[in-house]
Structures are given as structure tokens and as C-alpha cells.
């Protein structure tokens, strides 16, 4: 049906074009071609077909041109709609093509989801009759798959009967939940100073070696333990080595369990060496896995995208290959649309939520670059990891003054939480201002009030550190998950001066404030 309608629209549009002069603008007709299939997409059906392979009797075409990752396919009848998946026949490995443009009445221009080496003109191509479909459901947990849903972890097929198309509409307004609610992570510095909203989008900024991966793994672990929720990790344009390391670290820390079905995370990888088509779609594959857990199981899902910049970069490559006129700094003209289409699907509905943590690479540290600038428009919170804090041995190395959150508002988090958070930031800012004086003149030159500020700030700084459960293997410290009430109470008491008599090392790498008191008593015993 879709193929037939797509055919009619294509024929009528191209008929209309014949009447135009050679210089007449084409975008309106091209827009019509692009919009028709999307408008006719049916509601998502997870068990619509037992396998994503093309159906018998599907429309067959043949390859007429191969230009790198772009493949032109000619169909004698039944032109496939935009975004349909086509499958090349007569190959050992599965090669999926996605329809990107209609060229005239019988030819489509497609983007390959894998290498096009060995393709020849005349090869047969089958229309699957639907967009790329991938396996979804609990069976994907603990597994790694690629953009088209094939397992790449050498552990056999993913045994699920449920498949879903990677392209879908964002939830309707009536389905969305408007309640603003904190997603408690159990990480003190995050929950207190830059809390995550359920269904929010968080930007994670950090260089190499400051603890991005460990923070991501702890979030996956804590969400599973505190909320019973699942996580999905989408590696977009990842280094293969880093993806491999992450997988093995997850096995070591128990986030992935190879022996039974208790794994808490599904992994989707589209590495740096993949063609641009795969890198531009792998984030949607990860999002589709997460949407199943939200919509069918009512879960609060965590979706990690590393790195969201690579999604934009791949889109830019695809756009250039399709011959579109580039926009600012050479990016695709549809940059905001591509980003918005994906980001709008990450939201809270009345059934569940998808909270997304997106690692963001900033090209040449230029925040005005169109790629990061477009991403910022969608973020609800930013978590900035600082090398200076990591050098002090304070982990997680989250910068308490640079990290922000849209829900840090007394009407959402409550006035007590808000006042404590602002009090903590004020005392840390005062300490930062005094550091130059301390470096030049020393602590003795400070007034008594300033000495007290410095003392409390150093205790707060250390109390913002926390032993992680996933890092127990490396640190030897027992990991701690701290409830929000305990976090607020602890910082409130430090600000009030209730623990001015305790040494600052008692606050380092502990969970709730009671542990700091117990550690201080233990230190006193050792010194006596």
C-alpha cells in the first residue's frame, strides 16, 4: 500500500515538474515526496512481523550506480517510499540500503548502512516494505548490536519475536506527562547541584580520563538498583577500542551478566570506521530500544549517547553525498530538523520516561559552532567534568560551579533543597575567590570569617566526592548510593557549622554524613 501511494505521489509530482521551466525551483515538489510516506506511517506495532527480512513477493529493483556510500536503485514498478529499507541480494553479509531521495519516476537514491565494496551494477535489491526494523525487548539486555539490529558480540542471535522500525513520530501532546520530577541518581553532587529531570536531556562535558565512563556506568547501575530501570548505551562514532573497553568494564562491574538474564543495559554500536549512513542512524536504533522499555514496560529508561556530535557529523557527510547545498560551517541544511526529530522522541509520557545523557564534543572548544549550539537548545541540564577537580583526587570530578540544571527551581525541587544547593555554590565560589590570596599570602593573613569559609568549603568539596559501586574493584572503597534527603541533610549541617570540629579528611569518599562522623571518630582513635 505504501509503495503504491509513494508511486502515485512520485508520478503526479514528476508530471507537475514537466510543466515547469528549467529554472523553476524544485524544493516544493521534493518536500512533497519526502513528506508523503511519513504522513502515512502507521502506529508502531512491535510484533507485526517475526523477522525483519523482506517478504516474499516484495518489489525487486536493480543497482544502476554506486558512488561510495550512495547507491542508486531502479525499480520497474512499486517505487519504495522515503526511509524504506532495501536489501541487496546475492551477498554473504547482509547489506541494507535506506531510501533517501526519489530521482524521477523509477529510481531511488539510497544510503548504505555498511561498506559497498563488491557491489556491481545490475545486482538485485529487494524492498522490505518498511523502514529498518530492529529487535527490541528484554532479550536485547546484555547484548551489543549494530545499526540494523544484528548482534556483534559473537553470542548468537537475539531471540526475540518483537521488532520495531527505527523511524517513529515523537509522542503526541496528549501522551506527554507535564509533571517535573527529579530522577534521583544516588550521586550527591549531581542530585544536589544539577539534578536530572525524569525525561530530561543532560549534556555530559569532559575530556579524556576525567571519569566520563565511570560516571556513565554508575548511573546505569544506580538507575537499575534504585528504580529497577534499564539503560541503553548508543556508541555513535565511538572508537572501537573504547566501546570494547566499556563492554568488558561493564562485565567486570556486574552491569552486564553473561551467566543469567540480570543484565541492566543494552548496547548499540556504530563505530568510527562505519560508513556515514550507519553513524547517522545508530542513535535512532538505540532510541528505539529505549522506547520499547518506556512504552511497553512503563520503565524509566536511561539512554546514553556517546557522542552526539558524531551524529551531526555523520548527518553532514550524508547530506554532502546526496548533493544538498551546505549550510553554515559546511553542516547540512537540515541540521536543526535532524537533531529535533531525534531529541523530541526522548521525553516523558504517561507510561514511563527516557532520560538521556549525551556526551558532547565541542569542536575547537567553540561553543558557537552550529553542532553543539543546536544540541544546547535541547538540554535540560549540564554535567561538566573538570580535570582540575580530578587532579585533587575528588571523584566524581563534577564541577559544582559550572554544572547547571533547568529544574534547580524552588517550585520544583522545594525551597530547602534550593537554599542548600545555592548555599553550597556560594561558599565554594567564595573559596575560589580567596584562593589567590591564600596562594600569595597564606592562610594566616585571612580574617577569622574567611578562615571559617575556607574550612567549610574544603569539607564540602571533599563531601562532594563519593565511592562508586562500579569502581569498588579499583578503589577498594565500598560503593555508596545516597538518598536525596540524606544528601540535603548532610550539606545543610556542614553549612550550619555543626561539623566545624571534624577534620576535613573525614568527609572524603564517604556516603551520607553519618559515615563522615564515624570516620572522624575512627581517625581520632588512630591518632590517640
Swiss-Prot record:
Coiled coil: none annotated. Mg(2+) 1 binds at residue 213. The modification N6-succinyllysine is found at residues 124, 161, 259, 264, 522. Phosphate binds at residues 209-213. GO terms for molecular function: ATP binding; ATP hydrolysis activity; proton-transporting ATP synthase activity, rotational mechanism. Residues 1-46 form a transit peptide. Keywords: Acetylation, ATP synthesis, ATP-binding, CF(1), Glycoprotein, Hydrogen ion transport, Ion transport, Magnesium, Membrane, Metal-binding, Mitochondrion, Mitochondrion inner membrane, Nucleotide-binding, Phosphoprotein, Transit peptide, Translocase, Transport. Pfam families: ATP-synt_ab, ATP-synt_ab_N, ATP-synt_VA_C. GO terms for cellular component: mitochondrial inner membrane; mitochondrion; proton-transporting ATP synthase complex. It catalyses: ATP + H2O + 4 H(+)(in) = ADP + phosphate + 5 H(+)(out). The keyword Mitochondrion applies. It is an enzyme of class 7 (translocase). ATP binds at residues 209, 211-214, 239. The modification Phosphoserine is found at residues 415, 433. SMART domains: AAA (SM00382). Mg(2+) 2 binds at residue 238. GO terms for biological process: proton motive force-driven ATP synthesis; proton motive force-driven mitochondrial ATP synthesis. The modification N6-acetyllysine is found at residues 124, 161, 198, 259, 264, 426, 480, 485, 522. Homotrimer. Component of the ATP synthase complex composed at least of ATP5F1A/subunit alpha, ATP5F1B/subunit beta, ATP5MC1/subunit c (homooctomer), MT-ATP6/subunit a, MT-ATP8/subunit 8, ATP5ME/subunit e, ATP5MF/subunit f, ATP5MG/subunit g, ATP5MK/subunit k, ATP5MJ/subunit j, ATP5F1C/subunit gamma, ATP5F1D/subunit delta, ATP5F1E/subunit epsilon, ATP5PF/subunit F6, ATP5PB/subunit b, ATP5PD/subunit d, ATP5PO/subunit OSCP. Catalytic subunit beta, of the mitochondrial membrane ATP synthase complex (F(1)F(0) ATP synthase or Complex V) that produces ATP from ADP in the presence of a proton gradient across the membrane which is generated by electron transport complexes of the respiratory chain. ATP synthase complex consist of a soluble F(1) head domain - the catalytic core - and a membrane F(1) domain - the membrane proton channel. These two domains are linked by a central stalk rotating inside the F(1) region and a stationary peripheral stalk. Belongs to the ATPase alpha/beta chains family. This is ATP synthase F(1) complex catalytic subunit beta, mitochondrial. It comes from Bos taurus.
Amino acid at each position: 500500500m505504501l509503495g503504491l501511494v509513494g508511486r502515485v505521489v512520485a508520478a503526479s509530482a514528476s508530471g507537475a515538474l514537466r510543466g515547469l521551466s528549467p529554472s523553476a525551483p524544485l524544493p516544493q515538489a521534493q518536500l512533497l515526496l519526502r513528506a508523503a510516506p511519513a504522513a502515512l506511517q502507521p502506529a508502531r506495532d512491535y510484533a507485526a512481523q517475526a523477522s525483519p527480512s523482506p517478504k516474499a513477493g516484495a518489489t525487486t529493483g536493480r543497482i544502476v550506480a554506486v558512488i561510495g556510500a550512495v547507491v542508486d536503485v531502479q525499480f520497474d514498478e512499486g517505487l519504495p517510499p522515503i526511509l524504506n529499507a532495501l536489501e541487496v541480494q546475492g551477498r554473504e553479509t547482509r547489506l541494507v540500503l535506506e531510501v533517501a531521495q526519489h530521482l524521477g519516476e523509477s529510481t531511488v537514491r539510497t544510503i548504505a548502512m555498511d561498506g559497498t565494496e563488491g557491489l556491481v551494477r545490475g545486482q538485485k535489491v529487494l524492498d522490505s516494505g518498511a523502514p529498518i526494523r530492529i529487535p527490541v525487548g528484554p532479550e536485547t539486555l546484555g547484548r551489543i548490536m549494530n545499526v540494523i539490529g544484528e548482534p556483534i558480540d559473537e553470542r548468537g542471535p537475539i531471540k526475540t519475536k518483537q521488532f520495531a522500525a527505527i523511524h517513529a513520530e515523537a509522542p503526541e501532546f496528549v501522551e506527554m506527562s507535564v509533571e517535573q520530577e527529579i530522577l534521583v541518581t544516588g550521586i550527591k553532587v549531581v542530585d544536589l547541584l544539577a539534578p536530572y529531570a525524569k525525561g530530561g536531556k543532560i549534556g555530559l562535558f569532559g575530556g579524556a580520563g576525567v571519569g566520563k565512563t565511570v560516571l556513565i556506568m554508575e548511573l546505569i547501575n544506580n538507575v537499575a538498583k534504585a528504580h529497577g530501570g534499564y539503560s541503553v548505551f548508543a556508541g555513535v562514532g565511538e572508537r572501537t577500542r573504547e566501546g570494547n573497553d566499556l563492554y568488558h568494564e561493564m562485565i567486570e562491574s556486574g552491569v552486564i551478566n553473561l551467566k543469567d538474564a540480570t543484565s541492566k543495559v543494552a548496547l548499540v554500536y556504530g563505530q568510527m570506521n562505519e560508513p556515514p549512513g550507519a553513524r547517522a542512524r545508530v542513535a535512532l536504533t538505540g532510541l528505539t530500544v529505549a522506547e520499547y522499555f518506556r512504552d511497553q514496560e512503563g520503565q524509566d529508561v536511561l539512554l546514553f549517547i556517546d557522542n552526539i556530535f558524531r551524529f551531526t557529523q555523520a548527518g553532514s557527510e550524508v547530506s554532502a553525498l546526496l548533493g544538498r547545498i551546505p549550510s553554515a560551517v559546511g553542516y547540512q541544511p537540515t541540521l536543526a530538523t535532524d537533531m529535533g526529530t531525534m531529541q523530541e522522541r526522548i521525553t516523558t509520557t504517561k507510561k514511563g520516561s527516557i532520560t538521556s545523557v549525551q556526551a558532547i564534543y565541542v569542536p575547537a572548544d567553540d561553543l558557537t559552532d552550529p553542532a553543539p549550539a543546536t544540541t544546547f537548545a535541547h538540554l535540560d541540564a549540564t554535567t561538566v567534568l573538570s580535570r582540575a577537580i580530578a587532579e585533587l583526587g575528588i571523584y566524581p570530578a563534577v564541577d559544582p560551579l559550572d554544572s547547571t540544571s533547568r529544574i534547580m527551581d524552588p517550585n520544583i525541587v522545594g525551597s530547602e533543597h534550593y537554599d542548600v544547593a545555592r548555599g553550597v555554590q556560594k561558599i565554594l565560589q567564595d573559596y575560589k575567590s580567596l584562593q589567590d590570596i591564600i596562594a600569595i599570602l597564606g592562610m594566616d593573613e585571612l580574617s577569622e570569617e574567611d578562615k571559617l569559609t575556607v574550612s567549610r568549603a574544603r569539607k564540602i568539596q571533599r563531601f562532594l566526592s563519593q565511592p562508586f559501586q562500579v569502581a569498588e574493584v579499583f578503589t577498594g572503597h565500598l560503593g555508596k548510593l545516597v538518598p536525596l534527603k540524606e544528601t540535603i541533610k548532610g550539606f545543610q549541617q556542614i553549612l550550619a557549622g555543626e561539623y566545624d570540629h571534624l577534620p576535613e579528611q573525614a568527609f572524603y569518599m564517604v556516603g551520607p554524613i553519618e559515615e563522615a562522623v564515624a570516620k572522624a571518630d575512627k581517625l581520632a582513635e588512630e591518632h590517640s
